[in-house]
């Protein structure tokens, strides 16, 4: 993430966004090894859901009301679940090893937990 702006009140400064960004970079790395014929199928789907996770976190940061922020963060939480589902399919198709699946799944489980903590902090 070198070179990204880090001005005050910028979504790039949110730990939850940074963690999601790091997870997304791992997804890009792993999907680069998927078969070419999956480019418009599971590769595209997992990249879209992983990208949407951090995009929704960023979008929520720009929302004015807490209820609206939380609503968008719930969408991000759904995208995390979708990403984990795609990882399970990739494992089933043997596009990733069990170890790689466990690592990535754990990263996204932790991201989901952290997102829940962030959502709860906004509710107070």
Where do the protein language model's features map onto the residues?
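Amphipathic alpha-helical assembly/interaction segments
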Residues: 1-124
């Amino acid at each position: 993430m070198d070179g990204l702006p880090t001005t005050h009140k910028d979504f790039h400064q949110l730990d939850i966004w940074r963690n999601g960004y790091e997870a997304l970079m791992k997804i890009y790395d792993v999907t680069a090894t998927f078969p070419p014929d999956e480019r418009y199928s599971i590769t595209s789907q997992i990249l879209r859901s992983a990208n949407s996770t951090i995009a929704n976190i960023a979008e929520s940061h720009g929302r004015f009301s807490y209820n609206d922020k939380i609503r968008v963060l719930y969408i991000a939480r759904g995208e995390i679940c979708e990403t984990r589902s795609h990882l399970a399919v990739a494992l089933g198709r043997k596009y990733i090893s069990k170890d790689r699946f466990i690592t990535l799944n754990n990263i996204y489980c932790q991201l989901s937990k952290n997102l829940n903590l962030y959502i709860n902090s906004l509710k107070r």
